């Protein structure tokens, strides 16, 4: 393997790099800070980026930084997610068996979240990955879920994460206006520029333990 050839202790460019070792651009850190605010204030947020721009890395970092004594994080990633399976997925993660009808499952989830907030004194954060693949019916359901106690409070923070088309080809359209009006924060991760790309590579090579110069300036320009 190339790791031995270059004297590496760890593989530098893989998914399982520890969150604290991941490179963070200025845009990444700003978005991470915004998501922390979203979690604390129990808001509805949308995060988009082109493939390879750091969405999965952001989610991992966001999850790792939320204090476990203060938050319960629920995560779903299913391109065929329907409203019924949305509630079932969340209730399963909370250790509950969902009821058959969607409305009953929604009330069941809201009641459980009230217990979590009132008894455990924790806040719930729901992350939905690959959200650009969700159908309109499911996206609409988030609006209904967050309309709670006569719209006086949000039962949880909801973070939709997806490719750029989630915003450009769906949420910006008039048919999604009701959903868009509920969104409290929209963030996008841009492509890394030349300087950031060099810093990204240097950071991961440092994590690998490699002391050799592997990437020349010309190679970095090509990347």
Name every feature range the model reports, one short phrase each.
Residues 115-119, 150, 159, 167-222:
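Helix-loop-helix "sensor" segment of P-loop NTPases
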């Amino acid at each position: 393997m190339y790791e031995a050839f270059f004297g590496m202790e760890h593989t530098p460019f893989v998914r399982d790099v520890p969150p604290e070792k991941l490179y963070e651009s200025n845009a990444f850190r700003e978005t991470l800070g915004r998501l922390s605010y979203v979690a604390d204030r129990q808001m509805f947020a949308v995060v988009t980026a082109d493939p390879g721009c750091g969405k999965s890395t952001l989610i991992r970092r966001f999850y790792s930084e939320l204090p476990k004594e203060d938050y319960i994080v629920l995560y779903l990633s299913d391109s065929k997610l329907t409203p019924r399976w949305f509630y079932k997925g969340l209730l399963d993660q909370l250790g509950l068996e969902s009821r058959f009808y969607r409305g009953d499952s929604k009330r069941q989830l809201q009641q459980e979240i009230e217990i979590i907030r009132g008894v455990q004194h924790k806040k719930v954060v729901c992350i939905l990955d690959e959200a650009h693949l969700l159908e309109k019916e499911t996206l609409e359901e988030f609006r209904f879920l967050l309309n709670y106690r006569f719209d006086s409070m949000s039962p949880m923070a909801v973070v939709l994460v997806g490719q750029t088309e989630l915003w450009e080809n769906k949420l910006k359209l008039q048919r999604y206006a009701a959903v868009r009006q509920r969104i409290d924060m929209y963030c996008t991760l841009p492509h890394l520029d030349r300087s950031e790309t060099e810093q990204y590579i240097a950071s991961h090579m440092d994590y690998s333990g490699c002391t050799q110069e592997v990437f020349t300036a010309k190679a970095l320009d090509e990347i």
